[in-house]
């Protein structure tokens, strides 16, 4: 029986028609003289009715079917009796009286219920992913993914972009994370790398005159995993010639507005606010600030320059900072709750956490006796503290204070229920430093990647004051999650060689890793820039999920394995010999 309709295409306008349906048995209910079956296909559910008065043979076969059997049915669409309508179903006003049924495939009892809101170990869900994806919420996530990617393609096509695929097997040029390496059988002892991004190829496409490129690209990074990371992931990759930062930012805002409206029915306001990197780090403790709530961190370093409180004075004398966070309405916190925040601060690198409880007629704190009245007054004024508030302090090197205060801010936002979960709050973070100093390796590293252009006015201080150079970079952040990052690129060979030199790369190493790119820059390279978005992260936020694994068809676990296929796995000795490889025992 070849189906004539999907389940949810059936409505009151088709009542009286003969229909043929295919799908899975969702539930089966035997009411004595009648058997009711909810038939599920990708579109949804329709109720089937088996009656011996309609077709006795079909009724007896329905007695034998079970959940997840795949069946084909033929019958007549009817209105449900008024008292039995189901307002929770799109097809809740109709049902099909079955005249013929065929079992296309029986099914074993599933290891978990095929329904939403199940409490099942995620590894079990991943082992039986083909069953997990039958659940409505997982199906809906994949349908949302399809709509979002289609919106991306349609939008960029309408703006003159062309989709070009770049190589999966390429040269190893590590961009921060470790590469996944693929041994070559044809060239023994040599390896391809799976791309961490199409960065170099898309820039070469600009040299080739493609002008507007995009790709829904698969990327691979051998790094430690967490809820929003996978070893293989998808990104929307874009690059344009003859543009500046403003052109890219405006285009992306228009695209995001269209994606959210067409794919999810959500209206977002543009233009998005912009926040300089330094301000984000000072006021929110993160370059991925969540702006759905306040609790801004304030700078106290200048006003406390002459403080006698040793903890603050020591931090300032060693080139550090003192900052404070006014936890509004947290003055009722117990000492145990405050100590828990202090422990969290220490876990994240702080030496401790000073605090002041602001009460109606007094201040409770172990540090007020070390502060002058003027300092206390300035602290209260700068933080806007009132009775019932709790002031938390961070005093250390700027990067440590930013990290710790940012984590405390998020914890307090969650604890006090300040985060508007349904709100979509976009922000551009701009004016990044081009470089950051690695204390362990005693050299500068690229904040984003080594192809990001410095501000033109900063090129002259690249050698003398590299830490002060600002990048022509921009990140798009949504609700505290980085959606994507981009920049205007270096497009001249001498500037790119200068960047490699500042990063401590010798001319020989630069030629070995990037010689093909440097040579391409000698044949007329247009100014260009672009951006890349994590499709999985975007979908995680759109779908309201806590992990990218819920919006990917076949993700890996947090140990980078696949319970269903048992990848990664060993390979045969013959395969290793063909690749000139030998496994060394640990």
Curated annotation (Swiss-Prot):
Its EC number is 6.1.1.23. GO terms for molecular function: aspartate-tRNA ligase activity; aspartate-tRNA(Asn) ligase activity; ATP binding; catalytic activity, acting on a protein; nucleic acid binding; transferase activity. It is an enzyme of class 6 (ligase). Its main location: cytoplasm. The record marks 31 as: Important for tRNA non-discrimination. It catalyses: tRNA(Asx) + L-aspartate + ATP = L-aspartyl-tRNA(Asx) + AMP + diphosphate. One of its GO terms (cellular component) is cytoplasm. Homodimer. Belongs to the class-II aminoacyl-tRNA synthetase family. Type 1 subfamily. This is Aspartate--tRNA(Asp/Asn) ligase. It comes from Syntrophomonas wolfei subsp. wolfei (strain DSM 2245B / Goettingen).
